[in-house]
Amino acid sequence: MTAMNEPWPCASEFAILSSDVHARWKNFGNWDRTYFPKLVGLQVEDIRLGYCRMVLPFREELEQPMGIVHGGAIATLIDASVVPAIGSAYDNTIGYSTVDLHVQYHNALIKEDAIAEAWVTKRGRSVVFCESEVMGRTSGKRIARGFMTYNISTLRPMTK
């Protein structure tokens, strides 16, 4: 885990993905059916092995009554931004789910896009630890930081 005052790792520190894995994760959330990531408008800007940069474009619908972006939208960005970072190391037979999510809010996000830089800090056999840093795209302000633990498992066929 990086210290609170340390900057997050740079994308260039992470290995480039094969073209097929990159294509799979670059389109995260842009599926035929509308799932939650697409509903809130999340977009992957960069994906590498163990790393993802994702944007939450500003929309008025994401604001709370005081005119700032709702903390739940920021928490969603934090949680979702690590999914491609985790998944970049696995094939489609592996599932993962959030076990723990801790968010620290530093500043309000006001009428600007949020950019999350997310990375895997440690991979175990059944658990992955991740971090995500959210900044305002135009202001450059640190908006929030997230620390997550994900469970890793083999997918089982769905039954009716």
Residue ranges and their predicted role:
Residues 1-160:
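Terminal targeting signals and extreme-terminal segments of soluble enzymes
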